[in-house]
Amino acid sequence: MKSLSLLLAVALGLATAVSAGPAVIECWFVEDTSGKGLAKRPGALLLRQGQGEPPPRPDLDPELYLNVHDPTGFLQAAFRRYPRDAPAPHCEMSRFVPLPASANWASGLTPARNCPRALDGAWLMVSMSSPVLSLSSLLRPQPEPQQEPVLITMATVVLTVLTHTPAPRVRLGQDALLDLSFAYMPPTSEAASSLAAGPPPFGLEWRRQHLGKGHLLLAATPGLNGQMPAAQEGAVAFAAWDDDEPWGPWTGNGTFWLPRVQPFQEGTYLATIHLPYLQGQVTLELAVYKPPKVSLMPATLAWAAPGEAPPELLCLVSHFYPPGGLEVEWELRGGPGGRSQKAEGQRWLSALRHHSDGSVSLSGHLQPPPVTTEQHGARYACRIHHPSLPASGRSAEVTLEVAGLSGPSLEDSIGLFLSAFFLLGLFKALGWAAVYLSTCKDSKKKAE
């Protein structure tokens, strides 16, 4: 009975795993309408269907309602682990034309400049993005939609490029690791037989987008001879096929490592996989951060007489990044009524001070108004909010002491005791010295 229960639990677990993630991805087909700009038409990708027929979609052009066949399982695996509470990915698809890579360093991938006939026909490039992934896939649709039982077009996945870190956040000065993986299956048996056994050569390219131009950071063509551009900024890539099956499918790795990131390195990164006449590209947005430190001056106590203003309070907010998004708030805690409230007084911020590591600092100032006796023991707090901090922010506080209202504290008592002990010892030492000098004088007189 236990074994039956175990088998049932495993079966339910497998069914849950297989059914996880969206079964249909709504997508926009984008095309250029002869110089009139871009036009969009709705489409959909059917990644998985249950038993029976595909669900009908009379609202879609049958050529844009695609029943996706994924020989590598790579695309469907990405969505099986898609979180249920994550927003649906933004999806666009467009026409794709197989061409040799334009970069000189990738010319070894296509010794023959003419595209082989095995790659003739229609191609679609599908790009998806969400907070949990960035993905591009090359699909080869059938020439005509399937008529029965539902109007739908069969499409086969040939190349998929994927990252699970589309928006990495890296602390200033630490290393950035941008994951990239890909999978490829030759589109036809003819294309596979025209190549040598094993995975084909590929090219890996990482660029950072800056002012509308892509700055090449790293390029690699594993297994091919040829002069490659030097890697920039200490970048390293783990570029290799994961397996060497003779006829595919194959998966590969193109993860990118950037040491000790600085603020100038944040921005848009483009990762491109080049195969002979085929390409796939994903986009990542790298953000650099450093949480601020906060301290208050005076450090522990602020003294003031009734009716007088306490000394100016200085809130030091140091070594943070990015400069934007910082908020400095002043609070009075434990005042009249025991509640916290917004502190009154004049307040201002200093200019930013820039540090060699790219972080910045500033100081917030508060000149409190004259105090009353009811405010004795209240605490002035400086609270800061910054994108790198939790929603509650970070704070430091100083206690307000009103002169004439505070009795001796434990520290004061200890100080008085030590002072008295020191004075007692000093008096005894002086007494002994006086006795000694008096004895010496008497001895001299007797000797005379």
Swiss-Prot record:
Assembly, in brief, is: Heterodimer with PDIA3; disulfide-linked. Obligatory mediator for the interaction between newly assembled MHC class I molecules, calreticulin, PDIA3 and TAP. Up to 4 MHC class I/tapasin complexes bind to 1 TAP. Interacts with HLA-G-B2M complex; this interaction is required for loading of high affinity peptides. On its own or as part of MHC class I peptide loading complex, interacts with ligand-free MR1 or MR1-B2M complex, providing for stable MR1 pools ready for metabolite antigen processing.
Which parts of the sequence lie on the Cytoplasmic side of the lipid bilayer? 436-448
PANTHER family, per this entry? TAPASIN
Q: Which residues are glycosylated?
A: N253
Residues annotated as transmembrane:
415-435
Gene name in the database record: TAPBP
Name the UniProt key words of this record, in alphabetical order: Disulfide bond, Endoplasmic reticulum, Glycoprotein, Immunoglobulin domain, Membrane, Signal, Transmembrane, Transmembrane helix
Q: Name one Pfam family in it.
A: C1-set
SUPFAM superfamilies noted in UniProt:
Immunoglobulin
The record's annotation in Gene3D superfamilies points to: Immunoglobulins (2.60.40.10)
Q: What is this protein called?
A: Tapasin
Biological role stated in the UniProt entry: Involved in the association of MHC class I with transporter associated with antigen processing (TAP) and in the assembly of MHC class I with peptide (peptide loading).
Specify the taxonomic lineage: Eukaryota, Metazoa, Chordata, Craniata, Vertebrata
- PROSITE patterns membership: IG_LIKE (PS50835)
Q: Name one GO cellular component term.
A: endoplasmic reticulum membrane
Q: Which residues lie on this side of the membrane: Lumenal?
A: 21-414
Question: Where would you find this protein in the cell?
Answer: Endoplasmic reticulum membrane
Cite the Ig-like C1-type domain residue spans from the record.
Answer: 292-399
**Can you supply a Gene Ontology BP term from the record?**
antigen processing and presentation of endogenous peptide antigen via MHC class I
Q: How does it sit in the membrane?
A: Single-pass type I membrane protein
Q: Name the domain of life this protein comes from.
A: Eukaryota
Q: What is known of its domains?
A: The N-terminus is required for efficient association with MHC class I molecule and for a stable interaction between MHC I and calreticulin. Binding to TAP is mediated by the C-terminal region.
> Where exactly is the site May be involved in interaction with TAP?
K428
Signal peptide residue numbers:
1-20
Query: Disulfide pairs?
Result: C27-C91, C315-C382
